[in-house]
């Protein structure tokens, strides 16, 4: 079985531009390639799980999303980094699907397809829904404060959360180093 780090996309590995509608608008956050490369070098599968309701809303198509993900993979490859898989939910939040985070269907699909042991894996994201999904899966969870909708302005406010993360990091590189130190 493999261990994995499940990463949110917008606000965690890429700048959150409120519905990234074109590949030209996609921008990796600083040090993300280093973080992803570090995880892979330490034996982790790196899997992106992202909610993309802009498809259901008609803001962009699945073809456009594929172009955005191609750009992401290309930019990572320029730094000798790569993700092992990308899974996305195209549904509107009101549809009630099981694949939209904090739902766990995409995580289970990835775990099955990549022989991932969820108990030895991590979920990293910038929103409480990422933490909730990780907790439901039995993964360790890390909140990064790089997203504009991050639920905290300081780590202390998470103490009262019903499902606080296992760790709060300022960015993905710090999160990756914490994961490696604690795995």
Feature annotation, model-predicted:
Residues 12, 55, 59, 126, ...:
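Gly/Ser/Thr-rich helix-start
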Residues 1-47:
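Active-site neighborhood of HAD-like aspartate-dependent phosphohydrolases
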Residues 32, 36-69, 82-95, 134:
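Substrate-recognition element of Asp-dependent hydrolases with the DxDx(T/V) motif
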Residues 3, 63, 67-84, 92-123, ...:
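Asp-based, Mg2+/Mn2+-dependent phosphohydrolase catalytic module
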Residues 16, 58, 178:
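Residues that scaffold the ATP/ADP-binding catalytic core of kinase and kinase-like folds
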Residues 12-16, 51-53, 85-88, 108-111:
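A short alpha-helix capping/helix-coil boundary motif
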Residues 8-10, 51, 126, 130:
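Acidic active-site catalytic centers that drive phospho-/nucleotidyl reactions
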